[in-house]
């Protein structure tokens, strides 16, 4: 029987505001000993630079600095690498999370447009019946956004909009980020202590 800690998760980070969400998710999965297959879109790298101040000229060096100290394994796949392992349904994973998910990527997934590794990996989740979680970060929403989200929801995709709660008394930005990451982990029944639950 495969031990839980050896399982693979795919994490996508797009150019939507909130790259810190995807980074925290990756950190948390790696800290729990999981294997993470990471895909960052071109616009996602720009958000790394603009929002977080990271130097992105040496991408693999940056990722090693961010994630190299965790017990889990990180495998980085360039978004153009359509032949990567995660592009095939025969490669087994527990599911995929795109966090944050831009409306452009959400639309591509909704319409089966798999012209890069991010959207192809999401398409694989759908065709293989594996969990796919999207964390859209956009406001306000217009009708096309809502129609695409409804279409994906009807296909079994879990949508967890980046809408942190306040009932648990967050006092820092980290608290808000951890809440959203915790909600994603909840969708995979992964135990965590990232936020205080209602009634605790």
PLM feature spans:
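A cross-family phosphate/adenosyl-ligand binding-site feature
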Residues: 2-133, 139-200
């Amino acid at each position: 029987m495969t031990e839980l800690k050896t399982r693979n998760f795919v994490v996508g980070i797009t150019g939507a505001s909130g790259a810190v969400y995807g980074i925290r998710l990756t950190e948390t999965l790696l800290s729990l000993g999981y294997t993470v297959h990471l895909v960052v879109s071109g616009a996602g790298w720009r958000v790394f630079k603009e929002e977080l101040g990271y130097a992105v000229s040496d991408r693999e060096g940056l990722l090693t600095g961010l994630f190299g100290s965790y017990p889990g394994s990180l495998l980085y796949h360039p978004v153009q690498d359509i032949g990567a392992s995660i592009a095939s349904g025969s490669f087994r994973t527990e599911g995929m999370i795109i966090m944050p998910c831009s409306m452009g990527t959400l639309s591509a997934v909704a319409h089966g447009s798999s012209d890069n590794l991010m959207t192809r990996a999401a398409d694989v989740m759908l065709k293989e019946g594996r969990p796919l979680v999207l964390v859209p970060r956009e406001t306000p929403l217009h009708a096309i956004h809502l129609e695409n989200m409804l279409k994906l929801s009807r296909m079994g995709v879990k949508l967890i909009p980046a809408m942190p709660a306040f009932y648990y008394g967050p006092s820092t930005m980290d608290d808000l980020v951890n809440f959203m990451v915790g909600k994603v982990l909840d969708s995979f029944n992964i135990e965590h202590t990232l936020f205080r639950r209602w009634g605790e």
